[in-house]
């Protein structure tokens, strides 16, 4: 029976039911009307006010409201758990599976002790290392002196990253130059001297001051590195380097772009940037306003420089941004985009799925060591080096050409127009050459190798919509562009090798095997690409007879079909496509499938009993460069996801945003394709993009409920329990809330509304259009949605936020109830007596402690640390009120008020906690970092005054007249709307909003006379 009584007691505590909680000796009857002042003290034990008790019960004792809360809780927590389970345990398949190979190296690191306080003020906090691959690179030190003989490269680690992450790429560069130099095309290449910054695993993403420190240190480091090559003992007589190559991971890429904006930057000291999983497009977290300010400053600087055709950056600097795609669960791959900022003449974004011989997504940490990718990166770094130039890299145009050749799939429009190498004179006649006609299909196997080794395509006979398509599993096929150079003999041609148009594509692989390393060859090129030639010749002369040899060649008009289907069409029914025989490649453009929040599933079937080769599907979008190769499509359902138009990412509205799918299959067979929405994958993708909503939406819910609590309190003198007030709002206004959120989603996607929201944004950091380019726009508001169909997500996340608040409130009330039950009932009046006798002493010591905290914030600790102290004080306040309520049952209003405030402060503490991590990290390594903006006393004094005042067991006075009530109501509603509309991209400002609210509460408690 005792267990049942405890359970019943806990349940009453959770729902704040009136039964046996409020008796007639616990009601303050000093009020003579509904607008009387409310002030709870330990000595108020008068007889009850019958009308007040009736009003209280009319709000609290409504089971329907409790059922509404329970339904909302179950629905919200259910959604939250589904997304969490899918994120953590739902497996990725097919092209989204990681396929990185293992690696090994023999690293050594030499700390550059010469880079000390004489060269940088941050030498005590950060350090510089020189990497050497054992057995290949020079020994790092000789008699204590650094030995340098290559081209300087600086590696910048990311958030909490280590300088040791340089080893994989640096080792690959050394191995390429010293052991595989015969494959290098660039004869002016040189080995690379890799330097790496040691930031003591600083949390760069959390703190703008840390970003500034790192950028300042790196500028000093570059100055020092370049000075090392000016020393006479450096073994080179060539041009001294005037710049370094930068390779950066994660937030290191943002620090690298920040460097040129600082005063200590050496003009022209960096020509080449290569970033790995760096969030260029948007800050991954928004807990610190300084980070957002630095993003804005950096982007404006780069945009201004790139708009100036005479600037150094426009004419010399390249930036390649590589992202791991869907496997990166730390940073949304959308955030790595630079297309809105940097023109294609200076850089581009590419997904690792796209890169030839990589063809795999890569997670956030593996991107610095994945074997396939590091081999391509090392090739790029070495091939773009030039020992004879002071910049130590080839000119910008050549650098971008090499980047396109190495990092793109080869099927992009920007890849075209590279001239082939002069080959030889070639003699063709009817005995050795056959002419290919429109709609011809040529098939070659080991049993049908043609007697005529040349297949000729007369270019002049066809228009630009005719495509030459070639599929082969052989490496011994060439494409030649030939012209009739000898008028006396039309069978003799001058030819160039155009085999670079033939690209690798991943071969069908067994998912049970560890690796897939083999590739097929694919050519799909418009005849327009060959207009300067008379003939295009497919050369089979060197083909080798193999048991699985297969070659298909077709000449046909491109099968490009535009499909006008929307995600809403695919929600409940699938799009079916029939592919008749006759074409080697069939291409579809889905002009309305552009939203990255949707994922789709595709099934491919065929009536053919046998397949000459396994058909596969190429999926791609035009910006950024993202190509996926879906293999094994006949065996299983294929998941389709992409990174196109995404929340909070700038988008050029003049660029085609269609999703393209291309089926490569036997022209002898027919195929059937079915596409529909993949609900589970769509839910899985929500987490990575909306993690910050877990912090902002609950605050919107809490402040909305607080507004209602204050409204009822001002009118009737009842400060409702939090769950009771929430239940009343849900049961009464749920439909209004739902449609209001949907309407808000539609409004926030309108350009006029976005401009208005930016005008009234107190932070003024997120401009909906990018500088003067009105075609590049962004939606920073609410969930950043561009699709009206997904407006329902706002209500879903609001429900999840509500459920999380209910959960935390239940946990707090449970602990409060357990604490109350644990109190010794014999000491009923001890606390009241102690408070009566020592009030003056406690107040004196509290204000002394408050003064010391303010001094500490001004000089040493960030205000976020003081806020954590305020949260602890509020916890104590709530427990103290709980203990008094448990004995005298006369502080229900005071308990409800303190518990609601505690809920709000706990969620704000989640936002402030990362800055505290940075501060404690710096204390642990005994290094100081500037916390300039965090030493703002005004950002914490009102909160400290409020919680200190709460510790004296005071309630705010009920406001006099409508004006005071309006201030409380509108202030909290504004804070709730701000949390919804601006919160995700301005989490740092929510602290300041609560700080202003705290000042108002303090004013109501101390200075307001009430009514």
Swiss-Prot record:
Residues 28-47 are annotated as: Disordered. Keywords: Endoplasmic reticulum, Glycoprotein, Hydrolase, Membrane, Protein transport, Transmembrane, Transmembrane helix, Transport. GO terms for biological process: endoplasmic reticulum to Golgi vesicle-mediated transport; ERAD pathway; GPI anchor metabolic process; protein retention in ER lumen; protein transport; protein-lipid complex remodeling; vesicle organization. Its EC number is 3.1.-.-. The chain crosses the membrane at residues 72-92, 692-712, 717-737, 740-760, 792-812, 847-867, 900-920, 964-984, 987-1007. The active site is at residue 250. The keyword Repressor does not apply. It is found in: Endoplasmic reticulum membrane. It is a multi-pass membrane protein. Pfam families: PGAP1, PGAP1_2nd, PGAP1_TMD. Its main location: endoplasmic reticulum. GO terms for cellular component: endoplasmic reticulum membrane. Glycans are attached at residues 28, 66, 316, 417, 425, 654, 837, 898, 949, 957. It comes from the Eukaryota. GO terms for molecular function: phosphatidylinositol deacylase activity. Involved in inositol deacylation of GPI-anchored proteins which plays important roles in the quality control and ER-associated degradation of GPI-anchored proteins. Belongs to the GPI inositol-deacylase family. This is GPI inositol-deacylase. The gene is BST1.
């Amino acid at each position: 029976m005792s267990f049942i009584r405890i359970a019943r007691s806990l349940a009453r505590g959770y729902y704040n039911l009136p039964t046996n909680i409020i008796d007639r000796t616990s009601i303050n009857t000093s009020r003579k009307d509904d607008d009387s002042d409310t002030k709870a003290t330990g000595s108020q034990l008068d007889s009850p006010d019958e009308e007040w008790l009736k009003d209280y019960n009319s709000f609290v004792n409504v089971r329907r409201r409790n059922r509404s809360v329970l339904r909302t809780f179950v629905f919200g927590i259910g959604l939250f758990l589904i997304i969490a389970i899918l994120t953590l345990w739902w497996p990725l398949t097919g092209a989204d599976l990681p396929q990185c190979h293992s690696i090994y190296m023999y690293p050594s690191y030499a700390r550059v002790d010469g880079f000390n306080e004489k060269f940088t003020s941050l030498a005590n906090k950060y350090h510089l290392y020189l990497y050497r691959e054992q057995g290949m690179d020079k020994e790092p030190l000789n008699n204590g002196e650094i030995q340098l003989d290559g081209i300087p490269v600086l590696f910048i680690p990311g958030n909490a990253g280590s300088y040791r992450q340089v080893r994989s790429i640096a080792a690959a560069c050394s191995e390429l130059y010293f052991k595989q130099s015969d494959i290098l095309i660039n004869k002016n290449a040189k080995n690379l001297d890799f330097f790496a910054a040691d930031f003591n695993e600083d949390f760069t993403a959390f703190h703008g001051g840390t970003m500034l420190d790192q950028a300042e240190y790196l500028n000093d480091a570059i100055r020092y590195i370049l000075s090392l090559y000016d020393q006479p003992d450096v073994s080179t007589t060539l041009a001294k380097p005037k710049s370094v190559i930068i390779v950066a991971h994660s937030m290191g890429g943002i620090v690298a772009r920040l460097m040129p904006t600082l005063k200590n930057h050496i003009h022209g000291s960096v020509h080449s940037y290569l970033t790995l999983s760096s969030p260029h497009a948007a800050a991954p977290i928004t807990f610190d306003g300084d980070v957002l300010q630095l993003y804005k400053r950096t982007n404006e600087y780069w945009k201004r420089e790139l708009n100036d055709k005479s600037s150094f950056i426009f004419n010399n600097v390249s930036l390649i941004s590589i992202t791991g795609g869907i496997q990166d669960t730390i940073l949304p791959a959308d955030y790595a985009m630079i297309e809105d900022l940097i023109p294609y003449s200076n850089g581009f974004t590419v997904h690792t799925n796209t890169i030839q011989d990589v063809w795999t997504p890569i997670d956030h940490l593996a991107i610095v060591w994945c074997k396939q990718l590091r081999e391509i990166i090392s090739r790029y770094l070495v091939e773009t080096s030039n020992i004879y130039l002071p910049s130590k890299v080839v000119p910008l145009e050549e650098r971008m050409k090499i980047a396109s050749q190495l990092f793109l799939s080869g099927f992009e429009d920007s890849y075209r127009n590279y001239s082939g190498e002069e080959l030889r004179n070639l003699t063709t006649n009817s005995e050795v050459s056959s002419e290919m006609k429109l709609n011809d299909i040529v098939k070659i196997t080991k049993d049908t190798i043609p007697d005529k080794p040349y297949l000729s395509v007369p270019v002049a006979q066809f228009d630009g919509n005719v495509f030459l398509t070639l599929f082969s599993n052989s490496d011994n096929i060439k494409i030649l562009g030939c012209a009739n150079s000898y008028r006396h003999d039309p069978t003799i041609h001058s030819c160039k090798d155009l085999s670079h148009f033939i690209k690798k594509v991943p071969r069908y692989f067994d998912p049970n095997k560890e690796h897939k390393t083999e590739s097929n060859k694919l050519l799909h090129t418009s005849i327009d690409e060959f207009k300067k030639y008379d003939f295009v010749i497919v050369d089979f002369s060197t083909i080798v007879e193999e048991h699985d040899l297969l070659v298909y060649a077709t000449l046909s008009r491109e099968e490009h079909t535009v499909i006008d289907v929307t995600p809403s069409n695919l929600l409940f029914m699938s799009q079916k496509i029939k592919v008749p025989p006759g074409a080697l490649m069939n291409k579809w453009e889905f002009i309305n499938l552009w939203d990255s929040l949707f994922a789709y599933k595709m099934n491919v079937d065929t009536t053919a009993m046998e397949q000459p080769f396994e058909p596969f599907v190429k999926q791609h979008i035009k910006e950024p460069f993202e190509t996926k190769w879906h293999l094994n499509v006949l065996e299983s359902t294929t998941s389709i996801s992409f990174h196109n138009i995404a929340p909070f990412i700038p988008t050029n509205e003049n660029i085609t945003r269609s999703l393209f799918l291309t089926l490569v299959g036997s022209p002898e067979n027919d195929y059937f394709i079915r596409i529909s929405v993949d609900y589970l994958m769509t839910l899985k993708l929500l987490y990575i993009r909306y993690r910050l909503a877990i912090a902002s939406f609950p605050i919107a819910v809490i402040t909305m409920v607080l507004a209602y609590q204050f409204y009822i309190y001002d009118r009737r003198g009842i400060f409702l329990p939090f769950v009771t007030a929430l239940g009343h709002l849900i049961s009464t206004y749920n439909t209004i809330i739902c449609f209001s959120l949907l309407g808000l989603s539609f409004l926030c996607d309108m350009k006029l509304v976005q401009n208005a929201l930016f005008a009234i944004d107190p932070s003024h950091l997120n401009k909906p259009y990018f500088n003067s380019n009105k075609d590049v726009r962004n939606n920073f508001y609410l969930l950043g949605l561009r699709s009206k169909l997904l407006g329902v997500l706002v209500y879903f996340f609001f429900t999840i936020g509500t459920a999380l608040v209910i959960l935390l409130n239940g946990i707090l009330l449970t602990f409060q109830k357990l604490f109350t039950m644990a109190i010794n009932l014999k000491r009923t009046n001890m606390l009241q007596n102690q408070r009566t006798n020592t009030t003056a002493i406690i107040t004196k010591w509290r204000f002394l402690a408050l003064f010391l905290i303010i001094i500490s914030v001004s000089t040493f600790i960030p205000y976020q640390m003081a806020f954590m102290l305020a949260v602890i004080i509020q916890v104590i306040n709530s427990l103290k009120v709980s203990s008094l309520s448990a004995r005298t049952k006369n502080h229900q209003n005071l308990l409800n008020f303190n518990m609601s405030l505690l809920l709000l402060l706990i969620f704000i503490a989640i936002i402030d906690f990362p800055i505290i991590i940075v501060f404690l990290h710096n204390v642990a390594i005994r290094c100081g970092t500037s916390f300039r903006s965090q030493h703002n006393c005004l950002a914490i004094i009102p909160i400290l005054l409020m919680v200190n005042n709460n510790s004296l067991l005071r309630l705010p006075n009920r406001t006099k007249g409508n004006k005071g009530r309006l201030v409380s109501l509108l202030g909290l509603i504004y804070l709730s709307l701000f949390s919804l509309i601006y919160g995700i991209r301005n989490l740092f400002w929510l602290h300041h909003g609560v700080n202003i609210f705290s000042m108002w509460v303090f004013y109501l408690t101390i200075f307001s006379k009430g009514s």
